[in-house]
């Protein structure tokens, strides 16, 4: 995988503008992961940081089930009910993805609400191996 960054500002924010992945034989398209437990019940009301952490745990579990991990993530879509609060906690993404040596391209969108009331953060991913 080769990073494509015509400018360096996104690198400072922890993501690449694009990545070229050659020879990928398998792709996994992950549904949005949120801060829910194994029964699908929302967790950590009003705690953006805890919700981001649990959503990342759930993303890792889905990837593991597909025989992949965060190092395989090629693109992220992120939805937050409070973009400023989410950005304050983006160090969590940096720690998780940084430990795998990747900074996948991402889009962050502010939304009025997510599908389940009380959820503040959702992350979806495309992974390739």
Which residues does each PLM region occupy?
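N-terminal presequence-like segments and the immediate start of the first folded domain
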Residues: 1-57, 61-75, 80-129
């Amino acid at each position: 995988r080769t990073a494509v960054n015509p400018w360096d500002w996104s690198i400072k924010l922890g993501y690449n503008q694009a990545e070229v992945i050659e020879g990928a034989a398998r792709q996994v398209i992950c549904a949005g992961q949120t801060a829910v437990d194994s029964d699908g019940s929302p967790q950590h009301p009003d705690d953006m940081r805890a919700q981001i952490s649990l959503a990342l745990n759930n993303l890792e579990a889905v990837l593991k089930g597909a025989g992949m991990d965060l190092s395989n993530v090629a693109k992220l879509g992120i939805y937050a009910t409070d973009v400023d609060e989410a950005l304050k906690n983006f160090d969590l993404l940096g720690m998780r993805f940084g430990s795998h040596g990747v900074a996948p391209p991402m889009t962050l969108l502010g939304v009025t609400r997510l599908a389940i009331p009380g959820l503040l953060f959702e992350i979806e991913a495309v992974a390739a191996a």
